[in-house]
Amino acid sequence: SVMWMTTFKLYDYQEKLVDQARHILLNKSGVLIQSPPGSGKSVMIAEVVKNAVNKGNHILFIVHRKELSHQIKNTLTKHDVDLSQVDILSEKRAKNIMHKLTPPKIIVTDETHRSRAKTYKDIYDYFPNALRVGFTATPWRANSKGFTDIYDEMVKGPSVEWLINNNKLADYDYKSVVLADESKLKK
């Protein structure tokens, strides 16, 4: 089963989004998580990947720019993800070497772009049993052609206004530094 457990502290709204996505994937194969910049997307991504990997699953992680793969590796390493279970590739590269990849249990796409829907679809069609989880900060219309080709449902995070009003506009690195310092104080 794909159930993944929360291992590090997510904000309530982040946990809710991840839970909604998890729930959809019990019956469907693709979900897009749409959440604005500053909502702590990297934490949610790390959560999804870590829990899948902890169950022995392989992940294909698609980034839309090669430079981002370094950033993603850092995020995952920081959350103790076993990187030997994760292939981090641009969609072009993934498409070119699909036949060499370990078939993934989940394909995670960061910054899912409509313009690349065709390439994604080629990859998804090659791995028909893989679940698809996309993350984007850009609103998509759930009934648009590009969307329905790739995903079954969309879950939406809070608005930027809500994040600001609730003091939750996350700069995750800052938050983790603060938490680390607090733990030293307790000793």
For each feature predicted by the language model, list its residue ranges.
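Walker B catalytic acidic pair
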Residues: D110-E111
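Inter-Walker segment of RecA-like/P-loop motor cores
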Residues: H70-Q71, L76-P103
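Walker A/P-loop
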Residues: K28-E47
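Walker A/P-loop NTP-binding motif
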Residues: R22-H23, S42-K55
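Conserved Walker A/P-loop ATP-binding site and its immediately adjacent core
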Residues: M44, N57-T75
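Conserved pre-motif I regulatory segment
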Residues: W4-L32
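Post-DEXD/H (motif II) to motif III coupling segment of the RecA-like Helicase ATP-binding lobe
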Residues: A117-A170
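Loop/turn-to-beta-strand initiation segments
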Residues: H58, P104-I106, N129-V133
